[in-house]
C-alpha cells in the first residue's frame, strides 16, 4: 500500500482480529444493529443472520472484529474473491461513534488487508452512512435501484 494511515493517539491500539465460526453469534448481533441503524428493510432475525453469516464465512467472505482496549467495537465483512475487494458490511457500535473510531477502524482494515482500493454499497436513505463514507473520500460510481410492486 502506498500510504499508511495515522491513528489518533486516543485509539492507537486499534486491532484487527480475523473472525472464525465461534464469532458468528456476536457478528449476527452486530449485523442486526447495522440493519436497524442503516434503516434497511431486511426483516431477518438474529438466528437467521447467524445462518447467513455462517454461509458468508464458509464461502468467499472474511469477517474482522475491531478491538480497542480489549473491547470489540465493531466489525467488517469483506468479500475476498473480487478485485477490488468488496466491503459488504461495516459497523461500529453506537457507543463508540463520534470519536473517529469508525475512521480509524476503516484505515486499520485497509492497512491490514494491504489494499488501496475497496468497493462499498450504502443505502440511499442512510444519510449518516453516506456522509461517513464521503468523508473518507468515497465517490459514487453507480446507482442500484429496486422496483417493488404494491
What are these regions (language model features)?
Residues 113-123:
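Conserved GNAT acetyl-CoA-binding A-motif
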Residues 65, 71-79, 86, 91:
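Conserved beta-strand in the GNAT
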Residues 31-53:
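Conserved GNAT-fold acetyl-CoA-binding loop/helix
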Residues 13-29:
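A short beta-loop-alpha structural element at the N-terminal edge
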Residues 80-88, 97, 116, 140-142:
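A conserved beta-turn-beta hairpin within the catalytic core of GNAT-like acetyltransferases
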Residues 54-65:
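A short helix-loop-beta-strand connector motif used in the catalytic cores of GNAT acetyltransferases and
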Residues 103, 124-143:
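Conserved active-site alpha-helix within GNAT-family acetyltransferase domains
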Residues 96, 100-108:
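Conserved acetyl-CoA pyrophosphate-binding loop and the N-cap/start of the following alpha-helix
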Amino acid at each position: 500500500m502506498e500510504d499508511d494511515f495515522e491513528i489518533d493517539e486516543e485509539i492507537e491500539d486499534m486491532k484487527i482480529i480475523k473472525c472464525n465460526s465461534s464469532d458468528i453469534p456476536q457478528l449476527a448481533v452486530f449485523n442486526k444493529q447495522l440493519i436497524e441503524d442503516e434503516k434497511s428493510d431486511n426483516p431477518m432475525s438474529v438466528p437467521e443472520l447467524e445462518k447467513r453469516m455462517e454461509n458468508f464465512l464458509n464461502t468467499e467472505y472474511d469477517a474482522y472484529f475491531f478491538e480497542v482496549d480489549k473491547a470489540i467495537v465493531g466489525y467488517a465483512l469483506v468479500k475476498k474473491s473480487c478485485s477490488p475487494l468488496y466491503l459488504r458490511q461495516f459497523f461500529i457500535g453506537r457507543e463508540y461513534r463520534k470519536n473517529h473510531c469508525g475512521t480509524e477502524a476503516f484505515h486499520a482494515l485497509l492497512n491490514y488487508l494491504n489494499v488501496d482500493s475497496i468497493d462499498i454499497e450504502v443505502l440511499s436513505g442512510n444519510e449518516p452512512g453516506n456522509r461517513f463514507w464521503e468523508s473518507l473520500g468515497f465517490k459514487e460510481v453507480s446507482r442500484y435501484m429496486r422496483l417493488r410492486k404494491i
